[in-house]
Amino acid sequence: MQSENYCGLLALRLLVSYHLKIHSQLDGINGNAFSIKIIVTHLFKRITRCISFVMCAIYYLQLYIKAWSSMKRYRKSLPALGVLILLGTTWTPVHTYAQIGFPDDKPAGGGGGDLTRQLATNVSTGIITGILNGTVPLQTALPILGFTNSTNQTCVCVPSGRCATTTVPTDGSGMIDVRIVTSQTSSPISPTPNIVTPPTCAAGLDRCCYPGPFQCGLQYPAVAAAKAPAAGQAYYGEYPWQAVLLGPGDIYVGSGALIDPLNVITAAHRISEYVSGARALRVRLGEWDASAASEPIPALEYTVSKFFVHPSYNAANLQNDIAMLRLSSAVPLGATPTITTACLPATSFVGTTCWVSGWGKNDFVSGSYQAIQKKVDVAVRSPADCQTALRTTRLGSTFVLDATSFVCAGGEAGKDACTGDGGSPLVCSLGGRYFVVGLVAWGIGCGTSNIPGVYVNVASYVPWITSTVSLA
């Protein structure tokens, strides 16, 4: 502030005498004297600002020269510091996109069907520069945009002051995370590892490093700047793998789960009308409050370049109700704690309490879509138990549950996914990491006692997912 006052005084001393002289001359002019006086006054204000800018530049240049001469041992760092200051004052990475609407009705608490959202339109190369090319069981890993360095560490950006509370499993669990690149597949990311020193994270985030390759299914602490969630709501960034699917006009279509930098899995029945390509579909990551104009960390949005629907998908009974969406460009994993991947399951989670999240309706009959991401805990049930429960509904006593296609969870009154949640991930925790065990598929009503919800059994489709991600 003192330097700004100094610059202003310098400019003022240069102009005040000329300014007063011209004003005294204008006072003697008849007719349009007042208009001319306003114009000249406005002109002098602009000239004053320009001179102030020049004087400030000279002032800071003098400081820089003094620092250069007095800080000999730090001279190598000063040019870089100047570049960082310049970038810090000019880079504007976000843009506001309008019109995110929910179909049929208005979101609860959203204030209307058309919502606004702040998105990151680009990712600074100063934030994401490293490429990690590791391996996981079952296949070769797709290079991950993230931070890595010469000590074979992975560094991610977490909320400031929370690195110590970010626990990373060391037992190797969850290494089934799908990341593929083969000699037959051209990847949009160079397959050659580029080992660099991790740069700094964006404002409000700290760089947190752990040994080894990038790991899926990690849940990071809440961002301090985010507002506290209400009962039944997820905290901001709690489910960083969840994707929002948007149709033309930013209409909410459904949800999905990010499983690697280029692929999102979802329920096939949610995107069947988009597969032909006649209607554009987009994927938004890092979403939480769809009614807010901005959030602490901007969301990222991608167009879907390719659709892969399971070849045995049956629209009548929703068997094999799974699809994969190929994104137009790779997601920069590690840049923020609000976007990461979920792990793919390799074991049964029957009897485990898991979580489903989304923006679907809060009631089957008269519910509204939710502006803020909701969550609910549901227990995974055995196929036999699920079939028995569903036979008590209108499905009848002859209903046979396809245990390959489906997994069931829930049955506690008032706890369930509902209309609009299609494709939302059901995730279970194992060893401190989250696995996408199911995708919301169908149900009989919502939240009825002893009637579980039915989800796509993701474990059955891991081989299909693994082979599909390798397709060009």
Swiss-Prot record:
Compartment list: Membrane
Keywords: Disulfide bond, Glycoprotein, Membrane, Transmembrane, Transmembrane helix
Phenotype seen when the gene is deleted: Salivary gland extracts from mosquitoes with RNAi-mediated knockdown fail to induce migration of NIH 3T3 mouse embryonic fibroblasts. (Microbial infection) Salivary gland extracts from mosquitoes with RNAi-mediated knockdown enhance dengue virus type 2 infectivity in the host cells to a lesser degree.
A GO molecular function held by the record: serine-type endopeptidase activity
PROSITE patterns: TRYPSIN_DOM (PS50240)
Domain Peptidase S1: 223-470
Organism of this sequence: Aedes aegypti
Tissue expression notes: Expressed at highest levels in head and salivary gland. Expressed in ovary and carcass. Minimal expression in midgut.
Principal location listed in the UniProt entry: membrane
Positions of disulphide bridges: C354-C428, C386-C408, C418-C446
SUPFAM superfamilies attached to this UniProt entry: Trypsin-like serine proteases
Protein's UniProt name: Inactive CLIP domain-containing serine protease A3
Coiled-coil segments on the chain, per record: none
GO cellular component: membrane
Glycosylation, residue list: N122, N133, N149, N152
